Amino acid sequence: MLAFSDMNTGAGKIENGKKALKIVVVGDGAVGKTCLLLAFSKGEIPTAYVPTVFENFSHVMKYKNEEFILHLWDTAGQEEYDRLRPLSYADSDVVLLCFAVNNRTSFDNISTKWEPEIKHYIDTAKTVLVGLKVDLRKDGSDDVTKQEGDDLCQKLGCVAYIEASSVAKIGLNEVFEKSVDCIFSNKPVPKASVTTQAKSQESTQQKKKSKCLLQ
């Protein structure tokens, strides 16, 4: 097993001669995080919803004539796991900020909960915004639009906004290919807006004041 010894480098690692990175998936419960990981890595779709506490496994992905080892970490979105969830964040290279396009609350929570939480604990990790369940989007409804996702991506300074569907097998490879590219390529990461940067600095200051994660 790969030991991530250098905290929050955001630079990937080498394991058994292959480039490796740790990817953590966060977002509200039931937005499709587990389905995303299983559909991508195993081609499976769970038949029933079972809330995740912690789950992690590795997957070898072939991309650009090279093999990459992806260490995938699934996390619980429920509030009762708020104190435990950050234990999975250490040494993360990429964080997937996930919401369901047919669940506006999950979209709003990216800005109010998930992005601030990630910046608080692992502010050097790259972030990819992922809109899941695009196969369930209905025109003329209150569903989150592609433009709204693009705008939020730019506001938060995410590497990219990608829409995906585990059931329809849309965008799955793109999510993880982009994750690899943002770590092992030299392309600059978009800068967050001034407002977002100010919030991140405030979050970092709060982190320095906290003495214990678990009580």
Swiss-Prot record:
Residues 194-215 are annotated as: Disordered. A motif (Switch 1) lies at residues 43-54. It is found in: Cell membrane; Cytoplasm, Cytoskeleton; Cell projection, Phagocytic cup; Cytoplasmic vesicle, Phagosome. Its main location: membrane. It is a lipid-anchor. CDD domains: Rho. It catalyses: GTP + H2O = GDP + phosphate + H(+). PANTHER family: RHO FAMILY GTPASE. Interacts (GTP-bound form) with formin1 (via GBD/FH3 domain); the interaction activates formin1. Interacts (GTP-bound form) with profilin1. Interacts (GDP-bound form and when prenylated) with RhoGDI. This is Ras-like GTP-binding protein RHO1. It comes from Entamoeba histolytica (strain ATCC 30459 / HM-1:IMSS / ABRM). The gene is RHO1.
